Amino acid sequence: HLAVSAVVAGERFVVRMPKGEDGAEGIAREARLLAELAVGVRLEIPRYLFTAVNPIGPGERCVYPEVPGEVLGGREWRARGLLERGETARAVAEFVDAVHAFSAERARELGVPEWDPRTEFAEDLDLVRAQVIPLLPEAEGWRLVELWGEYLSVDGNFEYEPVLTHADVSLDHLLVTGDRITGVIDFGDVRIGDPDYDLCYLWSGAGAEFVRRVQDYRGRSLDERLIAKLEFWSCADHAIDVLHGIEHELPEFRDDSVRELRAALARVDGQSTGSL
């Protein structure tokens, strides 16, 4: 997407214009979904005013009032002490639960795709073995394959009621005003699938203790099964980024993703010997 900010009569608006078919489909899907989803979500999310002809590519552009708040990097979240505030974890917990409470059947009617993680990760493994493992030190390559196999082999990892998920709940998609979360953006990956996946990017970006507090507010536990899933996803996401960099001939992105993958593998082994 190309996103630009515009000021009209003193109010700020966002104009998003897709460059490809996937982006066009995403905007059309969001236009159908977000108006209904916003009814049950306390935090501000994009509320489309209208769509119109897209001047730079397929589909339509969308226009909506700018969601209040600013995007902060992980260091700034920590410098402001936001991850230690109970209200931060509570706001995230309420948002996640509100999204999950939206009717999955209605989401299907609105065109939200379904995610079959067991099938997709099984298909990805062959490519990971062929293209990603050779870029890693031998021990790290074996560790990644081990994590992948453990995830796929545990039936309990796939025993869940499919729900609507944001699927990209990360610190840079939670907008902050002062010391509180005021909005959530980037619904481009929304899908029907494993509810645990909405903790994936918080696990890698905000840390285990923050995820534990989110789960406490949700009345749920952070047990060993969930920890293992989150550890796997944190590594698999970077491995798939490596594949993306290779497929699209983006050597810098590929190399950055390899470094991120190695760091994620190191964190997994560090956490597995810690107090969790």
Where are the regions that the model predicts?
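ATP-binding pocket architecture of kinase catalytic cores
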Residues: 1-116, 159
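Active-site acidic catalytic loop and adjacent metal/ATP-binding pocket
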Residues: 2-7, 15, 146-199
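Glycine-rich, phosphate-binding/catalytic loops in enzymes
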Residues: 32, 80-81, 183, 200-202, ...
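Short helix-capping segments at alpha-helix termini
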Residues: 39-43, 139, 219-222
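Short, hydrophobic secondary-structure boundary micro-motifs
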Residues: 46-47, 73-76, 107-112, 184, ...
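An alpha-helical support segment within catalytic cores of ATP-dependent transferases
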Residues: 53-56, 68, 78-90, 101-167, ...
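Helix-rich C-terminal or lid/interface subdomains of diverse kinases
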Residues: 189-192, 200-276
